[in-house]
From Swiss-Prot:
Protein name, UniProt field: Thiazole synthase
Annotated family: Belongs to the ThiG family.
Gene: thiG
EC top class named in words: transferase
Pfam families per UniProt: ThiG
Length: 257
């Protein structure tokens, strides 16, 4: 029986979240979700056509998949709040990933505007998942204002550079009670497994899958990696040692005459 991941008022059996951007065609989305086992998909509200034309991304997302609209494009809290409300009005539910980015070079999140948006939206009944630069005091404040989880970046968005912030993420995992979902920059399944082995609650990937030579196969690889990393974390990896420790006896095998 699979372990249940309870977050945002829902119970999931997969700890891999999938992004919906950068695919060569939206028609890949059902196969990506099926191969990865993911039950949650994020999408930018600007890609949701409320007229429900053929290009509406919602046409390609299975009905049993949890929607996590994001506020991509928001430059401050007010814009993020407006996008979240539009998503709810469009029938996308109460989950929302807050992205507030005013830095156009590195696309780093504005933690302080993110806190402001989170506080307003949680008061309105949203399940808020804030994308953030990993900072313990910011994470604690997001917890205080009611975030459902925190989503620290592993590396800049779309960089595929891996878990560059591992020590800062590790601190969040150890010090706050909210689920920590590593988001952005994860480029290889091995990096997703590492995040899960550290104790992350889940991982969100997009670019690593969308830009792979075979996106469906890569989605499957990420699903397996996240599951393996979680299993390893629960198994309790052995302590590291500074010196060698033999796994077999070194004495008593050959008797001296």
């Amino acid at each position: 029986m699979k372990e249940v991941f309870s977050v945002g008022g829902k119970e999931l059996t997969s700890r891999l979240l999938i992004g919906s951007g950068k695919y060569s065609t939206n028609k890949l989305i059902p196969a990506i979700l099926d191969a990865s086992g993911s039950q949650v998909i994020t999408m930018a509200m600007r890609r949701v056509d409320t007229e429900f034309t053929e290009e509406n991304i919602l046409n390609y997302i299975p009905s049993d998949c949890v929607l996590m609209p994001n506020t991509s494009g928001a430059r401050n809290a007010q814009e993020a709040i407006r996008i979240a409300r539009l998503a709810r009005a469009a029938g996308c539910g109460d989950w929302v990933k807050i992205e507030v980015i005013s830095d156009n070079r590195y696309l780093l999140p504005d933690n302080y505007e993110t806190i402001r948006a989170t506080e307003v939206l949680t008061a309105e009944g949203f399940q808020v998942f804030p994308y953030m630069s990993p900072d313990l005091m910011v994470a604690k404040e997001l917890e205080r204002v009611g975030a459902a989880a925190v989503m620290p970046l592993g590396a800049p968005i779309g960089s595929n550079r891996g878990l560059q912030t591992r020590e800062l993420v590790r601190i969040l995992i150890e010090e706050i009670s909210l689920p920590v979902i590593v988001d952005a920059g994860i480029g290889r399944p091995s990096e997703a497994a590492e995040a899960m082995e550290m104790g992350a609650a889940a991982v969100l990937v997009n670019t690593a899958v969308a830009t792979a030579k075979d996106p469906v196969a890569m989605a499957r690889a990420f699903g397996l990696a996240v599951e393996a990393g979680r299993t390893a974390y629960l198994a309790g990896p052995g302590a590291t040692q500074q010196v060698a420790r033999a796994s077999s006896p070194l004495t008593g095998f050959l008797r001296e005459e």
